[in-house]
């Protein structure tokens, strides 16, 4: 059984058939989560970014999201990760970018910074990260020896 964390770019691609990553996201979802032994780890900030106005305006897409949500929950495969222990450090990192030369700064969203902190947390077991923003996570995955899938 693998613990697989995802970011919002993956979920947005999965539930929007017009998204450039839709086909690949669907392929990965089938490969990893039709297997009842894998668990889907979703940090709360990922949900806030995914269940956006864009998603809720398209009932068909929201219905697909709900279907998968209920199926994974029913199988015990869906784990929601509390971000509260990581919020302050993540926002402090965002603000510290103001004091860094532009070419040395990292333009990472608050949600991505929270995910990066969660990946390094020893209390949270993560085996795989699925993202289409490889550059935002390659260093931390390499350092922690996590499998990065895109």
Feature map (PLM): residue ranges:
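Metal-dependent nucleic-acid phosphoesterase active-site entry motif
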Residues: 1-23
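Acidic, PIN/NYN-like endoribonuclease modules and their adjacent C-terminal/linker elements
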Residues: 3, 116-150
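Short, basic/glycine-rich phosphate-binding loops at helix/coil junctions
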Residues: 6-9, 71-73, 92-99
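Alpha-helix/helix-capping structural signal
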Residues: 9-10, 45, 135
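Short, flexible helix/strand-to-coil boundary loops that buttress conserved ligand/catalytic motifs
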Residues: 15, 54, 141
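A metal-dependent, Asp-based hydrolase signature
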Residues: 59-65
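Active-site neighborhoods of divalent-metal-dependent phosphate/nucleic-acid chemistry enzymes
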Residues: 78-132
